[in-house]
A protein has these predicted regions:
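Structural core segment of the AMP-binding/adenylate-forming
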Residues: 110-115, 190, 217-289, 604
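Conserved pre-ATP/AMP-binding loop-to-beta segment of ANL
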Residues: 144, 159-160, 281-282, 292-313, ...
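Conserved AMP-binding/adenylation subdomain of ANL enzymes
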Residues: 219, 332-349, 357-397, 411
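AMP-binding/adenylate-forming catalytic core of the ANL superfamily
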Residues: 229-239, 246-250, 398, 509, ...
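Conserved AMP-binding/adenylate-forming core of the ANL superfamily
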Residues: 142-143, 148, 152, 160-213, ...
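Conserved AMP-binding A3 loop
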Residues: 172-175, 309-333
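Gly/Ser/Thr-rich phosphate-binding loop
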Residues: 370, 395-400, 409-472, 485
Length: 656
């Protein structure tokens, strides 16, 4: 019993020591600078002001920093031992029961769970520079906020308010909280523990919310998998994430994710459980059975904000997907600080056309948690389904990708449906043609059309605010989100570019991820020396700090040694009356090295223009002749990511 708890039982890594050690030591150390006698005078404001310099308790530090009390105790003890050469024992003595020992509350130390090696490796990936972590904590950007805490707050303060809404089906915050706790208990009975990864492949339905909140209830990590992915992607992502369970759809019409996961289990050494929503194939568990689990199962662990709680993968439009570990410090602080700047409160109703398996959709999910507002659910996007959902469900805020707006416009739905409930809408995921945003703002006069720039690695990095006006919002992706710093730099030298000049967009802030999981090569080039994340996006910043996205570094076309960005060509082609969407990318050329090829998807019923006609259209808009596309491909439908971004690597090759 006297052996206490060791590092594997507490979940402390050397990387965590490096990030939080100095912060914990400084907050715990008594600096003896007490002034006056506020305690005798009962001057509560002065007492609070003196609290930190006088030294905080481990519990107070845990609440401030976003760690568990035991983690703070361990880190403090080890830091004092290293700094002051004290003889403190590095194991923690945990007798249970608080002030008095109680046999029924005591768990023998050998019976405490231990974080798995995979869980510790994932925790070690959450490695932030100590000076940045200290800055974020001191400014209140990072605090001990978790999905479970927000869920319990909403259930206590707004028990009967809607949390997740489908036509004909509404779950209140109390129902979600109670159901998530039961499912968490069922997962705990299956042997899942803090730090274990659980893959979730579900559409935007209430079961996604239940699974997500249940896994993170006890400190598990949610790994999202997009709905279009099949066996090959499933095997790759579950293997890399080392997932111990997957929650997915059961028996389907043309494909069963649950059956595919069962069939792949021999090639997935960490996958122990397949949990199906709907009809479960033989060998799979049913989510309904977990929902019916014993509500009194005791889970002896509550997560903290520093714990990893998401494992996402980049969309892989130009390369293989990369694993992105994220915690509540990143995601929930970003949502909490962004909500008031968007004017969002508990009285709003948000609908996202983007899937919850993508960070853009999760941004709406997180905003719902931190504000207490309802998420209106669209399980699968089609232009009519989105337009009808807005008309019938009456959201006040809607998340679009530019392709969603283009598809609804091409289908003639903008003038046919009632969009008057929207007070603000957001466009993100790819570059939005300014002409389309101006047209939508004119069609929706009571709604403020805004843009957002984000990535899997950082959620919402920049956005325009509702008060910025369409003049800014149609052209610019936004200005820095709260707490972040954005700059535009030379991609090769790293020197900051003057206002108005194009360069790489780089960002630093409390929402930025710490680095890719098990990908040393990618991490070597992901950050600058002063820890700005290199986005790979090109843009320029105006005098007011607004940033316009002009393309991707990898999309630059090098025609005979002359380099140019094709995004302005894409925007103009998308404005052609016959064209719904367009993409321009380089193709090999024997003499020039590269030349531009245009791919277009036509509006319904439109006749395909030839290359000469399109080039004449571009010349009318004073495009330089060397930028004109020299190849043209008409496609029936573009290959798209789950957030409706064109995957240029999968475009068909032009004819010779």
């Amino acid at each position: 019993m006297a052996r206490g708890l060791n590092r594997r039982q507490i979940g402390v890594t050397e990387e965590m020591m490096a990030t939080f050690g100095e912060i914990v030591l400084r907050m715990s150390h008594n600096h003896q600078i007490r002034e006056g006698d506020p305690y005798r005078e009962k001057d509560w404001e002065e007492i609070e002001r003196h609290r930190e310099p006088m030294g905080l308790s481990d519990a107070q530090i845990a609440e401030r920093v976003g760690l568990s009390r035991n983690q703070v105790l361990y880190i403090r003890t080890l830091m004092e031992r290293r700094r002051f050469r004290t003889g403190h024992y590095v194991r923690l003595l945990d007798l249970g029961g608080g002030k008095r020992f109680r046999t029924e509350r005591f768990t023998p130390h050998l019976d405490h769970f231990r974080y798995s090696e995979d869980a510790l490796e994932l925790r070690a990936a959450m490695n932030y520079p100590p000076d940045q972590a200290r800055d974020y904590v001191e400014k209140g950007w990072w605090r001990n906020e978790t999905q479970r805490r927000y869920l319990e707050r909403n259930a206590a303060e707004r028990p009967d308010a809607p949390a997740y809404v489908l036509p004909g089906r509404t779950l209140t915050w109390k129902e979600v909280r109670d159901t998530a706790e039961r499912v968490a208990g069922g997962l705990w009975q299956l042997g899942l523990r803090p730090g274990d990864v659980v893959a979730v492949q579900l559409p935007n339905i209430p079961e996604f919310a239940i699974a997500n909140l249940a896994v993170t209830w006890f400190g598990g990590v949610v790994q999202t998998i997009h709905m279009p992915y099949r066996d090959a992607e499933l095997q790759t992502l579950v293997n890399h994430g080392r997932s111990r369970a997957i929650v997915c759809m059961g028996v389907g019409k043309d494909w069963s994710a649950a059956q595919a996961a069962l069939d792949l289990q021999p090639q997935l050494p960490t996958l122990r459980h397949v949990i199906a929503v709907g009809d479960a194939p033989d060998g799979a568990l049913s989510l309904d059975d977990l929902i019916a689990a014993d509500p009194d199962i005791e889970i002896g662990h509550e997560p903290s904000a520093a714990d990893p709680h998401l494992l996402l993968y980049t969309s892989g439009t130009t390369s293989s997907p990369k694993g992105v570990p994220l915690n509540s410090h990143n995601m929930l602080s970003n949502a909490r600080m962004s909500a008031p700047e968007k004017g969002l409160t508990a009285d709003d109703r948000i609908l996202t056309a983007a899937p919850f398996t993508h960070l853009y959709g999760l941004y709406a999910f997180h905003l719902g948690l931190v504000t207490g507002m309802a998420n209106l659910l669209l399980p699968a996007f089609t232009p009519p389904a989105l337009a009808e959902s807005i008309e019938k469900m009456r959201p006040t805020a809607v998340w679009f990708a530019p392709a969603h707006g283009a598809a609804m416009t091409a289908a003639g739905l903008i003038g046919k449906h009632d969009f008057s409930s929207m007070k603000m809408c957001l466009f993100a995921g790819s570059a939005a043609p300014p002409a389309m945003l101006h047209a939508l703002q004119e069609a929706w006069p009571g709604c403020r059309v805004c843009q957002l720039w984000g990535m899997t690695e950082l959620q919402a990095g920049m956005f325009t605010r509702p008060g910025d006006g369409i003049g800014k919002s149609a052209v610019f992706a936004g200005r820095a989100s709260p707490g972040s710093t954005v700059r535009v730099a030379d991609p090769e030298t790293g020197a900051e570019r003057p206002r108005g000049e194009e360069g790489e967009i780089q960002i630093r802030g409390p929402m930025v991820f710490p680095g890719y999981l098990r990908n040393k090569k990618a991490n070597e080039t992901a950050f600058t020396a002063d820890r700005f994340f290199r986005s790979g996006d090109l843009g320029y910043m105006d005098e007011d700090g607004f940033v316009a996205i002009t393309g991707r570094i990898k999309d630059i076309i090098n025609r005979g040694g002359v380099k140019f960005n094709p995004q302005d060509i894409e925007n103009l082609l998308s404005a052609h009356p016959a064209v719904q969407m367009a993409a321009v990318a380089p193709v090999p050329h024997d003499v020039l090295g590269e030349q531009a090829c245009a791919w277009i998807q036509l509006n319904p019923g439109a006749e395909a223009p030839d290359l000469e006609t399109l080039c004449a259209f571009l010349m009318e808009h004073r495009i330089a002749r060397n930028k004109l596309p020299e190849k043209l491909v008409v496609v029936d439908e573009f290959p798209m990511t789950p957030t409706r971004k064109i995957i240029k690597g999968r475009l068909p090759a032009p004819a010779e």
